[in-house]
Amino acid sequence: MAAAAGGPCVRSSRELWTILLGRSALRELSQIEAELNKHWRRLLEGLSYYKPPSPSSAEKVKANKDVASPLKELGLRISKFLGLDEEQSVQLLQCYLQEDYRGTRDSVKTVLQDERQSQALILKIADYYYEERTCILRCVLHLLTYFQDERHPYRVEYADCVDKLEKELVSKYRQQFEELYKTEAPTWETHGNLMTERQVSRWFVQCLREQSMLLEIIFLYYAYFEMAPSDLLVLTKMFKEQGFGSRQTNRHLVDETMDPFVDRIGYFSALILVEGMDIESLHKCALDDRRELHQFAQDGLICQDMDCLMLTFGDIPHHAPVLLAWALLRHTLNPEETSSVVRKIGGTAIQLNVFQYLTRLLQSLASGGNDCTTSTACMCVYGLLSFVLTSLELHTLGNQQDIIDTACEVLADPSLPELFWGTEPTSGLGIILDSVCGMFPHLLSPLLQLLRALVSGKSTAKKVYSFLDKMSFYNELYKHKPHDVISHEDGTLWRRQTPKLLYPLGGQTNLRIPQGTVGQVMLDDRAYLVRWEYSYSSWTLFTCEIEMLLHVVSTADVIQHCQRVKPIIDLVHKVISTDLSIADCLLPITSRIYMLLQRLTTVISPPVDVIASCVNCLTVLAARNPAKVWTDLRHTGFLPFVAHPVSSLSQMISAEGMNAGGYGNLLMNSEQPQGEYGVTIAFLRLITTLVKGQLGSTQSQGLVPCVMFVLKEMLPSYHKWRYNSHGVREQIGCLILELIHAILNLCHETDLHSSHTPSLQFLCICSLAYTEAGQTVINIMGIGVDTIDMVMAAQPRSDGAEGQGQGQLLIKTVKLAFSVTNNVIRLKPPSNVVSPLEQALSQHGAHGNNLIAVLAKYIYHKHDPALPRLAIQLLKRLATVAPMSVYACLGNDAAAIRDAFLTRLQSKIEDMRIKVMILEFLTVAVETQPGLIELFLNLEVKDGSDGSKEFSLGMWSCLHAVLELIDSQQQDRYWCPPLLHRAAIAFLHALWQDRRDSAMLVLRTKPKFWENLTSPLFGTLSPPSETSEPSILETCALIMKIICLEIYYVVKGSLDQSLKDTLKKFSIEKRFAYWSGYVKSLAVHVAETEGSSCTSLLEYQMLVSAWRMLLIIATTHADIMHLTDSVVRRQLFLDVLDGTKALLLVPASVNCLRLGSMKCTLLLILLRQWKRELGSVDEILGPLTEILEGVLQADQQLMEKTKAKVFSAFITVLQMKEMKVSDIPQYSQLVLNVCETLQEEVIALFDQTRHSLALGSATEDKDSMETDDCSRSRHRDQRDGVCVLGLHLAKELCEVDEDGDSWLQVTRRLPILPTLLTTLEVSLRMKQNLHFTEATLHLLLTLARTQQGATAVAGAGITQSICLPLLSVYQLSTNGTAQTPSASRKSLDAPSWPGVYRLSMSLMEQLLKTLRYNFLPEALDFVGVHQERTLQCLNAVRTVQSLACLEEADHTVGFILQLSNFMKEWHFHLPQLMRDIQVNLGYLCQACTSLLHSRKMLQHYLQNKNGDGLPSAVAQRVQRPPSAASAAPSSSKQPAADTEASEQQALHTVQYGLLKILSKTLAALRHFTPDVCQILLDQSLDLAEYNFLFALSFTTPTFDSEVAPSFGTLLATVNVALNMLGELDKKKEPLTQAVGLSTQAEGTRTLKSLLMFTMENCFYLLISQAMRYLRDPAVHPRDKQRMKQELSSELSTLLSSLSRYFRRGAPSSPATGVLPSPQGKSTSLSKASPESQEPLIQLVQAFVRHMQR
């Protein structure tokens, strides 16, 4: 950037000063030392560093090729205007362009071409030049201030530099001083026509400022180093010639604005001469009586010359201290020789009011100089004053009050009171103390004024307290001799005859002088001053004085009495503010202050100064005990108050019903008319102290009227009030903002809307956002950088930014305004209406004068680095929340402001915090300010060779600075602390997150970009317990996130090679293991400290979050990340597990739980992704059990999601391998924990469901076969909620428990089953809580597999909970239309109400299977209640082949199959239903056979009847088996072949479904037909028990519901089965994939078994039914004969096919396999072995032979 200004520029003096102050980036001792070593000669040369113009220098400039010619021309013009060396002028111009120029570099050219603009530029450069000169002197002053200060960090470096300067400094600076006051003023003839009168005046102000600073340096120098007598003579002559500043060569130019500078020159001249006389060592010599040792005692000639000079002094006030000091010196060293001269000189000094002058001098220095100069001056004057008082009689020194005033000013230096109390009370200032005691308490004020000055620290405060506590004399003035005293003969002693009450109205606390007390009498102006020898405590006396004032408040004496009480209150204030512990002793006084306030505010013209003192006292007390002060104050009526409690915000903001109180009246009636605001300042400090005291909420409510008064009556209008003194208005503004700032920063009001009445914080926010108070704050922020710079420049101060001048107050006020506005926007509750404050902040003003532009221009401010920082912080906030473009607001200045931002960002010495704030602002701008960020990125576009756009970094791109900051090679050379590094990385992260492609493109092409970016990830961090810099963790977290974003968004092949190399290096160097271990140790550290002492918890969370993201990306992109080693993966998982365990075992700490919850997510994801590589399950289960216990102990609301994650992890682990109870640690405890949680959750769900029912918010019934899964907010019935997952986990645990013992124990201890069933019943009735219902049924189904479990479930009343309530799941919907089973297009796996029905059916089937006769009545009840649905379902298969329909039919037939075992009982209870079901089963068998027989017809049905295409669920189900190579991709744009394939898959799935239904249907029918053995052999069989199931017809069934199922149906079924078996053998059928088993072979085996089972049952039914016909006498013999013939031929044909098939080798029947087998008498064929299937053939052959007989 410097190159843009035309070449490198040297270090400017202002930069040097910033570095020495420690406000730059260079803060190391070595860096300070290097700067001083490099520049000490400049400091020694001082102002003569800047040379006058010379021809040789001009030639050098012209010959310099590096500087552009326009700049050379301008440099030469500057040289003439400033009278400065040409080379230095060009250098100055370059420095100015670099540091202070407010345009862009490009605009310099146009400025140079325009005469008017170039003239304005020269004038600005002149100001810059003057500032540079001043900064050299400031540097020297700074060195002299601190080079002996042990507390200063750079003392040694400063001292080394001062050693180098010491010898020549004074001579050079003295010479410069002479040159300055003798220099002729510049004129337009000598310096060009720019040198107007105004510029000459400006030059002269600078000349005077430099003179005063040079003298200040010389004064400080001589405070440390001795002045030779000859130097004193030279200086005295010089100052006399210059008239102590008043006889300037250019004195005709002096106007009143320059008086402060002229006075300062005079003051320093006088101080230098007094310091040079070395009065302190003179005092020591006199005390030791060795006067001859003093340097002036040995140099008589110089003394005589000085005498002569001194005799000519006396015409100006500045001579006074010099004359006094010299008189003292001569009087001490040669009392005899010079008595007349001494008297004359001393007399002149007293006539010049020397003490008044010294007071003025010290006051002037205190108000406008650095503390060191002031304290040095105090020491100097203290020495003089002490010696004067010791050496001379007090009465010869003029007015005693003047001496007291001077003493008080001197004692303002904190170290001097300590010194005073350590010296003899009879010498020095002790004499004046003794003197004022002689008039106490007749005259209170002088003693109290002096004692107030003598309080500086706790020890001195205690000394003052003790001094006043033990007074031994009481002084009284009498105009006439009283009657009750006896006088001594010479009248010098009086004795009291009667005791005297000193305060007749003093009340209980009083003083009484006892009888016989002796008093010394002094006659004074015809009055008697009596000094009674009486011991008392002055504090008691002060209490009496206050009591007196309270009594005379309503009389005319009040003003006179106030003058006595004010010093008392002031002293009390000083004492308790120094040492609060003394306040307890002063309770009698402080407790009366409240009454004083109350009484004095009601006086006709209130004594404002006394009231202010009282309030100041209370402020100090409030710091220690705010509640007590507040309570006592309320009763006084002094503070604003409300008559009736106000609760609504509108009433508060309108100040309705609020009373201004005593203070409000004072402000309106006394202070504003008078223009003095002592009480207001005290009031604001008091309220701020009370607010900071964090009173309770009720007391804070009491402060509302006070705060409202400030916001409504003071803040909007204080700048319009009348003011007598300069600076008070700014002070009041600053105090008001401090109060608001304190309120907005209250931490106990975190929840702004918790209580029913608005809090103070909320009140402030609303007032500032919506009332005119906010406009005032905006006006303060709008003061602007130029105004502040003008105020700073006008100050006569020597030390620039330090201290407490007008400029500093203004800067502080503006900073507070920034902070307040920032907080208001941050804390304001979100609302749709834009508040007036936000509107004013973000509106676009004309000509760039809007607030945004003003804020941005604070970047030009140089005095206080916090000001631009806070301005940028507010800009950052506005850029985030306000709907406006910062870029548009900046207007034409945008580029220039950008340059200023970047100049400060790239500067090597700039304060690090400003750089951080600039980067943070840019980070926010990436997301919210597109225009602005483009300006800062400054990317240049050019067309590439291949027609694409190529981007490169412009010269003014912020990325230069960012790349430099992250450059790992440069970090040693260029100091980049962790905070700054973090800010740079955060900016890059924002670019990645916001997908700023052009910027990312450029960055990726930068060499070593990825290497530099990721270098922190390869470092080694100190362990978490020792980390001092948590920002490093945040940096690493952001880098991890950038890597994740890059890998996630960039196509695999397009990743940069350097990034790939970096990731490979990351893996090779075992950084995964390192970071995993670090994150684990971090978790352990947080757990050990219980999350309490962790100030850096936010950074920890960021790191854990980023590490989580990195590992999740690594699971999906393992090859890119090189995380393929299963050993490493296992270790990473175990680290996460251990870390999570450590955190979640601290259930009391919210921080630990939050962090643990974050890690829990990662744990779950890794578990699911890597479950095949995690090895032993045992290592995982133990810690998981502990984690669960920790989570269950924590705050349940907080842990809701975490608990769900832990449950989910458990489920995953339990599914990883088959386990026994013994494999799981603490199995029974685990089951108990899960069940206890479930108990609570289910009860809560029950309550929630009942509550929603009460509110009438039950969801409307949906189509019964559709999924009713409307997501309800914060509902407990969530698929991933604790309740549902808990049920699934319980089911997994239940599956492990083979005999059900553990569960039996839990169900005895906890009423978990009744709770579940009750809630299940309600859920079913209301058709709510779908996920819960489904999960519960799954659990019950698992329980029902064991005898004990089934007994428990049945005993808990399962039938009542399911049987009737289940009706509401599928009954008529609210529109009254009957439901038909519709084709659900949703995945069958998604929970749905039809699914619930199916599960209920399965549960009934399982319970019946397990409990048999014990559950039969319930099963019959169930089938009876749901008979319509059952029959409907069996019928539906023919018309609807959707998966949902087939599934339901499958479940229904399964249940019927179980129930058919109990045919007799069924027939007894529900004969008609049984008959209906038998018929329907026949028709179902026929439908399935038809559909299986004609594949084309089935396909046609699937395509047309069920809508176009196939259920998506089908495609999904098909893909599930891992071996399914031909599984259809689920892309929406499939090619034709894929579509065909997926249709085929779907067809096979439906076929498989039909086949399962068919096999179960036949098995069930088999129970409704006579047993084959029985009917063949048993003649006495009761045929009436068995109905005919199939008609006597042998035609192949058509697909028509009218045709009854017949023998033809059964034969067709056998044929279909045989054909399918044949196809299976020929490997034509990919039907096996539909089975869903892992391998093709297993699928084939299962299918063959199923087909065989179907055939067996067909033959069985054929034989049984045929025999039934043959045995039935009601059947016509002709029909029997026909049947025999038909059946024989059909069976013979079938037998031959069957024999052929068996010869090839056939499978076994799965009678005991996949399907529940009939549990009645089993025939031989159900036990047929795989080797010989002949028994089946034999049976059929035997039957055929039987019939043919």
Curated annotation (Swiss-Prot):
The modification Phosphothreonine is found at residue 1712. Its main location: nucleus. GO terms for molecular function: structural constituent of nuclear pore. Keywords: Acetylation, Cataract, Disease variant, Microphthalmia, mRNA transport, Nuclear pore complex, Nucleus, Phosphoprotein, Protein transport, Translocation, Transport. Residues 1514-1542, 1707-1733 are annotated as: Disordered. GO terms for cellular component: cytosol; membrane; nuclear envelope; nuclear pore; nuclear pore inner ring. The keyword Transport applies. Part of the nuclear pore complex (NPC). Component of the nuclear pore complex (NPC), a complex required for the trafficking across the nuclear envelope. Required for proper protein transport into the nucleus. This is Nucleoporin NUP188. The gene is NUP188.
